[in-house]
Amino acid sequence: MKKYLLLFVFFSFFKTIYAQSNDYKSILTVSAFAPFRDQRYNIGYMRKINERWWVGSELAYGTDKITPVNIANFEGENRIFEIKPEVFYSLAPQSRLKHFVSVEAFYLNQIGKNISGKYYDENDVYYSFSSADYKRIKYGLNINYSILIHKESSWFGFMPKIGFGIRQKNISYTNMAGKEEDYAPVDGLPFDYHSNRQGSNLRLNFNVDMKFIFKF
């Protein structure tokens, strides 16, 4: 009996979503890239204020136990939390393909305990280490462009997003053991070499993502 009741609730929920899809005011987003590229799961919510304006926010979380790849190329206990409030402006509110320009603030906090790996110090010397505690703080502002790709009668769709902005990043290592100078990497992506660089820096920030969307 409980099984049939759960099935009834499940189908009633999606029937309601389908019925409201033509007059949706809310969108739930799930990032397709974040678990594999950013080592965290990202879920967002958008709310329609009027024909032109939407507001929303994204929350992201990851640990070494739940993400499919190692966080920050380190082995050990890792945790990432990120929040990104955002304001959207619809460029073509009457179009089936919704075009948005948005301003997004973001804050990221990453903590690593008893991790092992490799990194650049502030003098561009490359080291390996057997154990350390790690902290990364990143915050900044992006300007984004995104497109809502969907059918008006459907509750599901896609939203590619691209943007750029500025960010401040602070990385520190403490309680380090087994530190040794190592050979700098010569293969892989160039920006990946310096992703764990110790110290603080202010640089451009780029944002590329693909969202699965659920309208209701």
Predicted features by range, described:
Residues M1-Y24, F212-F216:
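Bacterial Sec-dependent N-terminal signal peptides
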Residues S31, L59-E82, Q110-K138, Q168-D182, ...:
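Extracellular/periplasm-exposed beta-strand and loop segments of Gram-negative cell-envelope proteins
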Residues L28-A32, S57-L59, P85-V87, H99-A105, ...:
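Membrane-embedded beta-strand positions of outer-membrane beta-barrel proteins
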Residues A19-I71, K211-K215:
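Short glycine/proline- and aromatic-enriched beta-strand/turn motifs that initiate or cap beta-hairpins
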Residues A32-F36, L59-K65, Y89, A105-I111, ...:
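Transmembrane beta-strands of outer-membrane beta-barrel pores
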Residues R52-V55, S95-R96, K151-F156:
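Repeated loop/turn-to-beta-strand initiation elements of outer-membrane beta-barrel proteins
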Residues F88, L202-F216:
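Outer-membrane beta-barrel "beta-signal"
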Residues R79-Y89, Y139-L148:
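Transmembrane beta-barrel strand/turn architecture of Gram-negative outer membrane proteins
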